[in-house]
């Protein structure tokens, strides 16, 4: 944990008073289960707390940043920011993937690169930071790690391409829109999906992503950028 403490101190000016709390935040259930006799705590409870404070602070930021956006748009943007893939990306940006304590089986199966585990650890860290410091310190960290990406428009880009495409195509009546996986490559824990979107059986766009949902969004974006003429 000393290397993690160095990263936190040098990059984020964070020094934990309770080192055990920090260690718990990076302890996956698989590691705790393999060391039951030591009664090691895992990070699920801290994840619960971190999720709550993250939702609160992102909601507050969006409410103040976009005074004219309706509730529905704010909710969609927040969902994009706090989704699993985003949280895993934040964890990687912070080098957190290097410090998660995993059981041997989970490590062997590629758990260190799994979005679910990384996202959970990121939220657990926020929960630990809240308990060790206060909500102001969590906010400072979020504004350093997450908010610059929000303001750069990273989450606006794919907010609603599927809905936008549907609205464009159905302006003159219902049409059958379907997404299908063309191929998937890579190991189970790090797959890449290729998806195409079809209208009345005709392929109108293709996209790639590390989840089916992201690939579908990219396919919809591809179709929108081609224009309606190619879709009908």
From Swiss-Prot:
Top-level taxon of origin: Bacteria
Domain RNase III: 5-134
Cell location: Cytoplasm
Gene Ontology molecular functions: double-stranded RNA binding; metal ion binding; ribonuclease III activity; rRNA binding
Main location: cytoplasm
GO annotation, cellular component aspect: cytoplasm
Annotated GO biological process: mRNA processing; regulation of gene expression; rRNA processing; tRNA processing
SUPFAM superfamilies registered for this protein in UniProt: dsRNA-binding domain-like (SSF54768), RNase III domain-like (SSF69065)
Disulfide cysteine pairs (residue numbers): none
Catalytic activity: Endonucleolytic cleavage to 5'-phosphomonoester
N-terminal signal peptide: none
Keywords: Cytoplasm, Endonuclease, Hydrolase, Magnesium, Metal-binding, mRNA processing, Nuclease, RNA-binding, rRNA processing, rRNA-binding, tRNA processing
Cofactors demanded by this protein: Mg(2+)
Residues annotated as binding Mg(2+): 47, 120, 123
Enzyme active site: 51, 123
E.C. designation(s): 3.1.26.3
Residues annotated as domain DRBM: 160-229
Function according to Swiss-Prot or TrEMBL: Digests double-stranded RNA. Involved in the processing of primary rRNA transcript to yield the immediate precursors to the large and small rRNAs (23S and 16S). Processes some mRNAs, and tRNAs when they are encoded in the rRNA operon. Processes pre-crRNA and tracrRNA of type II CRISPR loci if present in the organism.
Oligomeric and partner information: Homodimer.
Similarity comment text for this entry: Belongs to the ribonuclease III family.
Name used for this protein in its record: Ribonuclease 3
């Amino acid at each position: 944990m000393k290397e993690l403490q160095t990263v936190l101190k040098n990059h984020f000016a964070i020094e934990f008073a309770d080192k055990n709390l920090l260690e718990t935040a990076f302890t996956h259930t698989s590691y705790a289960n393999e060391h039951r006799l030591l009664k090691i705590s895992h990070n699920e409870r801290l994840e619960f707390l971190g999720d709550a404070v993250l939702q609160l602070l992102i909601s507050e930021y969006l409410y103040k940043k976009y005074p004219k956006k309706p509730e529905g748009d704010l909710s969609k943007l927040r969902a994009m920011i706090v989704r699993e893939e985003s949280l895993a990306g934040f964890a990687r940006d912070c080098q957190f993937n290097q410090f998660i304590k995993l059981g041997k089986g989970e490590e062997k199966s590629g758990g260190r690169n799994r979005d679910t585990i990384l996202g959970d650890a990121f939220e657990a860290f926020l929960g630990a930071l809240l308990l060790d410091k206060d909500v102001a310190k969590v906010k400072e960290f979020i504004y350093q790690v997450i908010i610059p990406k929000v303001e750069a428009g990273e989450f606006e880009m794919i907010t609603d391409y599927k809905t936008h495409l549907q609205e464009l195509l159905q302006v003159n009546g219902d049409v059958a829109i379907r997404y299908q996986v063309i191929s998937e490559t890579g190991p189970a824990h790090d797959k890449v999906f290729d998806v195409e979107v079809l209208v009345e059986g005709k392929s109108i766009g293709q996209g790639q992503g590390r989840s089916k949902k992201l690939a579908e969004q990219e396919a919809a974006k591809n179709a929108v950028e081609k224009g309606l003429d190619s879709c009908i």
